[in-house]
Amino acid sequence: GINKQNNVNGNVEYIALQFPIHKRLAMSVGLLPYSYVGYSFGAQRTNEANLNYVETYNGSGGLNDLYVGLSIDVWKKRLSVGANFGYFFGNIKHEQYSIVGTGNTYNANRSQNLEVRDLKMDFGVQYTHPISKTEEVTLGLTFSPKKRLHSTYTNTSVKYTDNGASEVISSDTLKNQAYDIPNSFGFGASYVKKDKLTLAADVLYETWGKAHFYSSDNNFKNRVRVAAGGEFIPNAQNRNFFSRVRYRAGAHYSNSYLMINN
């Protein structure tokens, strides 16, 4: 008997629009990815009956943030504050397959599906200080408060026989389950010399160590992400193509919020 299963997944990278609605008020709307799951690995094992089988683990899906943002110029186009009002949605699926390579045994599939639908908010403040007519420095702070998202969690186990029949061993659907996204604190700074040089860096700190995921309270640790980048234009006014090319480089580092037991 041959068992075959196909999965097709799609994902939108991002959509974002910004536009002024008043001389001191601007709006932004967009669809941004918040998290992404994508993995596949397996191993050959031996069960209690001394039969060899292949165990495969797959993960797919992600969470997206559909948001509307507002920002207000508080002081002389230098100091501004803003907030995003977002709708969180998405599905995350984890699957485990056990495939036995004999004609009188069965294959098994266990899947866990998380479906999230909820609201969230983010806040920010930004200050720009001009150094000269062509240079400025910008500093920014962001804060996203901890949010307990309401979600639906489905855990299903299915057995497949060689003749193509399937039997649901167990299926549990838990609605209005608790799934946390943590407090998030961000700081960024940039230096811009008009038509010449841009340097920027930011730091993000997330308190995953206090996050809750259903019955698990101790599987996460706090996460730090550091990123830096720059852009250089040799001569923006020169007619030579390579003099007007924007040369960019960047790097980032982050630790995982997952706590792996040794």
Listing of model-derived features with the role each one plays in the protein:
Residues 1-262:
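Subset of outer-membrane beta-barrel
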